């Protein structure tokens, strides 16, 4: 673990003490690396002066790989072994990958994360990403002339535990020490906040190659606070390419294409999309493997019309992020545009129209995330300069909870909570003599465990046997600055403890998270009714167990008629508990509680007499 330097507040480290750290934007389409030199963040270029590294890896038969531009050239000739947009596969199972059937890869649907079969062997998305990160590390060390102490790597705000952990694993494989994982919109806000001295409420609209993220941030006196986040993984520059690709096939009347022809036309579609940002029309020329020639002219108006629905879809999560932050459009002081896809004029116009202001784009949208990450990396490495006294407050996208009796969810950390954070709650045992407690960690907004996502389970054993409800078990949830969760459980009387770091097998897609939130809103009334029923059923089960235990121990305190009355009340509770009317269950439980008050009083009297028997007054 790298040691942080300690210096007087406001003092910068001496030049010979400057520690080399970088910010890395590991993007779907392109990746970048940046650092801070002479207090100014800058992109580190390769030996040919190029700042962008295409996020493409081409595997060869001899086991080696080409990364970046050289790999990009192989997309048309060897698409099966040329992995592009690998970020979309990080922490995902095969069923989670959009358009999987249209991709040229041989996927292996292995437990956990999907694998890709190449001529160089089976590769995981983590290994592919590590190739890109290792190239960026080498590029940075060549430019800076020394080894790096660490890196801040950016991830989409909606990446969950598994996707973040996969990113950290890839960095470790690439020989990088991860100082922190930083949400991409937050990195952009850091760049704008420091460069432009901005204060107020800002929306960060981040449309990259494969994901769409929107974050609402508040910048006040050096504090960067994320108020809410939103997003949709079905929206990205790749989807605009795919729509134009389909349009080309329709216009040219082409039959089903081979993998190579598909790859050729996808590249042509991407090139045309980029040209239409500055031209009114462009000609798409291609020669297919069959010898057939494709000549199609596409205008900017055509492109706007065919992709307008994609642009409109970005506004829905933007509206939701504002609602989550408790704000309206009028409360937003500015909009930051991030991601290469925001270069498209009709996207900028749609965002400007929605927020009724001209979006901020004076920092290159391809570079702004890496520049912000570099600033954060510089601070975490200990290179604090005068004025570097700002605070970063990020949030988690979905609530984290625990399963309680009856399959109910008790939320421990609500969504949009600022991280890093820790929350603790006390729980107890349900049965007499219970010596173990199962801790089931879940993620989501619904009231029942079956409607949420299971993250992990562990057991706390060694609880001293005692009456139900007597044990005190403190469960603590901790989310670190990278958004990774750890949970511990401790029985307070005995001190026995168990813990777990949550590393689920694969992650949630952005649209799955958005769908979970939508489901929670739509099902709120049904969920609350289901929760009310389960709570009453759990209480009924508890009081039946307690009453039966009391009868078994102290039936001699009751007359035959009294005992029969209590047994009848018990039967009523059991019968009501098997039904679906929570009010009927509550009425039966209340009747049993009232009907056993005298019995409880007699048991208490006996216990007191037994405790005082044989003792003198001065001993009490």
UniProtKB/Swiss-Prot annotation:
Presence of keyword Nucleotide-binding: yes
GO molecular function, one term: ATP hydrolysis activity
Domain of life from the UniProt record: Bacteria
One of the GO biological process terms: iron-sulfur cluster assembly
Keyword set, alphabetical order: ATP-binding, Chaperone, Nucleotide-binding
InterPro entries: ATPase_NBD (IPR043129), Heat_shock_70_CS (IPR018181), HSP70_C_sf (IPR029048), HSP70_peptide-bd_sf (IPR029047), Hsp_70_fam (IPR013126), ISC_FeS_clus_asmbl_HscA (IPR010236)
Chain segments annotated as transmembrane: none
Gene3D superfamilies attached to this UniProt entry: 1.20.1270.10, 3.30.420.40, Actin, Chain A, domain 4, Substrate Binding Domain Of DNAk, Chain A, domain 1
Record bears the keyword Chaperone: yes
UniProt xrefs under NCBIfam families: HscA, PRK05183.1
Biological function: Chaperone involved in the maturation of iron-sulfur cluster-containing proteins. Has a low intrinsic ATPase activity which is markedly stimulated by HscB.
Family: Belongs to the heat shock protein 70 family.
Name of the protein in its database record: Chaperone protein HscA homolog
Organism: Herminiimonas arsenicoxydans
Gene that this sequence comes from: hscA
